[in-house]
Amino acid sequence: MNTLTVKDIKDRLQEVKDAQDPFIAQCENDPRKSVQTLVEQWLKKQAKEKALKEQWVNMTSYERLARNKGFRLIAGVDEVGRGPLAGPVVASAVILPEECEILGLTDSKKLSEKKREEYYELIMKEALAVGIGIVEATVIDEINIYEASKMAMVKAIQDLSDTPDYLLVDAMTLPLDTAQASIIKGDAKSVSIAAGACIAKVTRDRMMSAYAETYPMYGFEKNKGYGTKEHLEALAAYGPTELHRKTFAPVQSFR
């Protein structure tokens, strides 16, 4: 074993996939501290990958259940933007292929902006179909945010290039004939819903950053329309824009 350099061992560990591989035992018996460090790093990496695979299996349980009932095109649907004082509510519907594996995909609120962007690209690459639904602030004011959220979800489903035969929806029942399941906190329990939430979140964040170029004083690129101190101070100084939800407190007080 000592005939192998540390670099040789590092390169070979890249090819080892099983902790029971005899090479791992050989490395563990190697007296060199640098080799011991490599083994520890490899074992940690394997444990992390195992945990992510187990998470993926758990988060595909609703999809497997639907497929066992004969459904094939299963769309996960979620929306973002219920709480902000400005900007649209955005929904996305995503149909993932049965064989895909996007490890680490989970509730978008638990992911960093960088990670969401990475998963956005992966989902767009892997998905069979992605649909987007957008409902602007003026409509939110007319029909309320709950109804606007449902409308955005329906629009997202209608925007899909393939027609789903089953829907997994985050905490909502939609006025559609399509078979569906409403799942509380679905973006943490279903990969399809998590994918929809990620696409919706990144899409909306990009929209708000673009709006910031037209309305730089409100800090939309940072607050995404939420009622931060900076945003409220801008509302007090400049009043609401066409992007603001006039029926939302405290926007009403600045009209």
Curated annotation (Swiss-Prot):
Its cofactor is Mn(2+); Mg(2+). The lineage of its organism: Bacteria, Bacillati, Bacillota, Bacilli, Bacillales. Keywords: Cytoplasm, Endonuclease, Hydrolase, Manganese, Metal-binding, Nuclease. Transmembrane segments: none annotated. Manganese or magnesium. Binds 1 divalent metal ion per monomer in the absence of substrate. May bind a second metal ion after substrate binding. GO terms for molecular function: manganese ion binding; RNA binding; RNA-DNA hybrid ribonuclease activity. This is Ribonuclease HII. CDD domains: RNase_HII_bacteria_HII_like. Endonuclease that specifically degrades the RNA of RNA-DNA hybrids. One of its GO terms (cellular component) is ribonuclease H2 complex. It comes from Bacillus subtilis (strain 168). Its EC number is 3.1.26.4. It catalyses: Endonucleolytic cleavage to 5'-phosphomonoester. Residues 72-255 form the RNase H type-2 domain. InterPro entries: RNase_HII, RNase_HII/HIII, RNase_HII/HIII_dom, RNaseH-like_sf, RNaseH_sf. One of its GO terms (biological process) is DNA replication, removal of RNA primer.
